[in-house]
């Protein structure tokens, strides 16, 4: 699975709001399939398609480690260490224009991927109750059908009993 390549405009050039880039990469690494990243996109490189595609395939001389690169590194680590993200079943819990919640589950664990794709805070309906662990912060959360999200926030949650 990929979000851009040498034949299409880079995703960073398409998005009006670059704060959505981490959300796209979260989907890439947590949905079924093998994630592929076109060189330079891990840094948020832009490029538009033209008659000879030179903007899509520039020479990269300087490595630009940034916040997006950090996010992708964490997602690679998460996918490598949680079999549900590679082999688990996918269940869509709720998808709207501004939010997305889905589940990845195998025989070992059940992960809930939750995203606020909006530039303002919102409360998302959460079709689940109980104790969960936030995979990024290790914070234990007691959830009762709703969850508060900051703008563009992503949470990957695991039931604490798994």
Feature annotation, model-predicted:
Residues 32, 37, 41-162:
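Carbohydrate-interacting/catalytic domains
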Residues 1-34, 43, 50, 85, ...:
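Alpha-amylase-like alpha-glycosidases and glucanotransferases acting on alpha-linked glucans and related
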């Amino acid at each position: 699975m990929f979000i851009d390549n040498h034949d299409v405009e880079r995703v960073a050039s398409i998005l009006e709001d670059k704060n959505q880039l981490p959300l796209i990469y979260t989907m890439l690494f947590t949905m079924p399939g093998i994630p592929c990243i076109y060189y330079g996109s891990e840094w948020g490189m832009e490029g538009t398609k033209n008659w000879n595609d030179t903007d899509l395939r520039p020479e990269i001389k300087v490595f630009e480690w940034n916040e997006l690169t950090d996010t992708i590194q964490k997602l690679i680590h998460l996918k490598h260490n949680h079999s549900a993200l590679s082999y688990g079943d996918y269940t869509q819990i709720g998808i709207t224009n501004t939010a997305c919640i889905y589940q990845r589950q195998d025989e070992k664990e059940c992960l809930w991927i939750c995203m606020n794709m909006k530039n303002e805070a919102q409360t998302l309906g959460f079709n689940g109750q109980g104790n969960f662990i936030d995979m990024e912060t290790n914070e234990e959360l007691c959830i009762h059908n709703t969850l508060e999200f900051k703008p563009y926030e992503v949470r990957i949650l695991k039931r604490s009993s798994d």
